[in-house]
Regions:
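Loop-to-helix transition at the N-terminal end of transmembrane alpha-helices
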Residues: 14-25, 48-60
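TerminUS-proximal long segments
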Residues: 307-399
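Transmembrane-helix bundle segments that line or gate the permeation/cavity pathway
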Residues: 26-44, 54-86, 92-142, 159-163, ...
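Membrane-interface transmembrane-helix boundary segments in multi-pass integral membrane proteins
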Residues: 19-23, 94-97, 192-196, 258-285, ...
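Membrane-helix interface motif
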Residues: 2-3, 71-81, 172-183, 248-260, ...
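Juxtamembrane/interface segments at transmembrane-helix termini
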Residues: 6, 41-48, 74-77, 113-124, ...
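Long, contiguous internal "core" modules enriched in hydrophobic/ aromatic residues
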Residues: 24-26, 109-306, 312, 319, ...
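N-terminal signal-anchor module of multipass membrane proteins
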Residues: 1-42, 369, 386, 394-399
């Protein structure tokens, strides 16, 4: 079949670029990290105790930076709060401000109750500016006894249970926005929110796994082979679920065979051939899933198991970023004429270029470093003793 490409004259630019790719990537990591802490605080999975509180700090750091790419994308970022002050309830983006603010408050309260005992002890041992800051964070209340500890644990449980649906909505909200745009067939699929949510969980699990191995190596977190296996198990399960969702989504497009299938198939096998099939599905998803499967199939030593898990986590972080790219940018590569394509080549020093995307991706790590100056990632003496006891009783069964 011979056809001629044609694009409308006013339809030649990519509007949503790297900033809109970076935002769902950061928010996905936030969701995955929070999910790890929820599995311990709400569902009582004891093997995740060494990373339960640290995951809260990771989630909080990425949540604080999640909106920065969006603000950089706006022409007038000073007007961003208008979506909250003067909301339009018929606008899909109008509810984002409320959902984000709600989850930010919930997460901050969870961290406050989870770290209250640590902050009290740190305030007693500190002096100068750090002591003043900790005293303010504690709201000038440093009472600590068995009753207050019980209240703290109960509040962490209640708030985390409330935060789970809030986190799910916030993480899947981007997928909901894309899926609701019926004018774009590459985005308009009912599976889009679930694809964004599950891939976000994968990225959060992968990053926490890498940070846990790094901090455990230098003694900042308690080493636990049981915790490592649980994180890798969750990563394998989430990856398997994501593979199913991606496969079902592609089958949905193929068997629906709508008028837009011609442009979607052309997009996949031309413009996105390398980034989708090779980088995302092949190198990112395929290699990582094979590594994770081999980890639980082969009888590996703890060191080899940890190394393979770290490599798989790196591949999955890359895969999730490529997935964001292929959806956000890939969905804008074809013209509204459905027979023409656009070109997009991001530059390094643009306002929304490669350098700014790298800066916004690395910024949460600086925030995490600053947060850990006041909230220690090391387990308390009570937690460490409990963890050693439980690990000793379960090690033979799990290993």
């Amino acid at each position: 079949m011979i056809y001629t490409e044609f694009s409308f004259p006013n339809d030649s630019h990519i509007i949503w670029s790297l900033m809109i790719v970076t935002y769902p990537y950061i928010s996905g990591i936030m969701a995955g990290a929070f999910g790890i802490s929820a599995l311990y605080f709400v569902f009582g999975i004891e093997s995740l105790k060494p990373v339960s509180r640290f995951s809260l700090l990771v989630s909080f750091s990425f949540l604080l930076c999640a909106t920065l790419p969006l603000l950089n994308h706006l022409g007038h970022p000073e007007r961003a709060l208008n979506v909250v002050i003067v909301p339009n309830h018929r606008s899909a983006i109008g509810g984002f401000g409320y959902i984000y603010s709600l989850f930010l408050v919930i997460l901050a309260m969870i961290i406050w109750f989870a770290y209250r005992e640590d902050m009290i002890r740190a305030a007693e041992a500190a002096s100068g500016l750090k002591k003043r800051i900790l005293t303010i964070l504690l709201l000038w209340n440093q009472n600590l006894n068995d009753d207050t500890r019980q209240v703290d644990r109960q509040m962490v449980f209640i708030l985390t249970a409330i935060g789970i649906p809030s986190m799910a909505v916030l993480s899947g909200y981007v997928g909901f926005l894309f899926g609701s745009l019926k004018s774009n067939p590459w985005w308009s699929t009912p599976l889009m929110p679930f694809v964004f949510f599950v891939s976000g969980i994968i990225s959060g699990l992968a990053l926490v796994l890498l940070l846990y191995l790094y901090l455990g190596w230098y003694g900042y977190l308690e080493k636990s082979y049981i915790c490592l296996r649980m994180l890798c198990s969750l990563l394998w399960f989430s990856t398997a679920m994501y593979i199913v969702l991606e496969g079902v989504e592609l089958l949905y497009f193929y068997y629906e065979s709508s008028d837009a299938w011609f442009v979607i198939s052309t997009l996949l096998f031309t413009k996105l051939k390398y980034s989708f099939f090779v980088l995302q599905l092949g190198i990112g998803l395929g290699v990582a899933f094979v590594l994770l499967s081999a980890m639980f199939t082969l009888k590996l030593e703890e060191t080899s198991f940890a190394k393979m898990g770290a490599v798989a986590a790196v591949y999955l972080l890359f895969e999730v970023w490529m997935m964001r790219w292929n959806i956000v940018v890939g969905g804008q590569l074809f013209s509204k004429s459905y027979v023409g394509f656009r070109e997009f080549h991001p530059q390094w020093l643009e306002k929304e270029g490669i350098l700014m995307a790298i800066v916004f991706t690395l910024l949460p790590f600086l925030v995490l470093f600053a947060v850990t100056r006041f909230l220690s990632v090391r387990p308390t003496t009570e937690e460490a003793s409990e963890h050693i006891t439980s690990s000793g009783s379960q090690a033979g069964e799990n290993i």
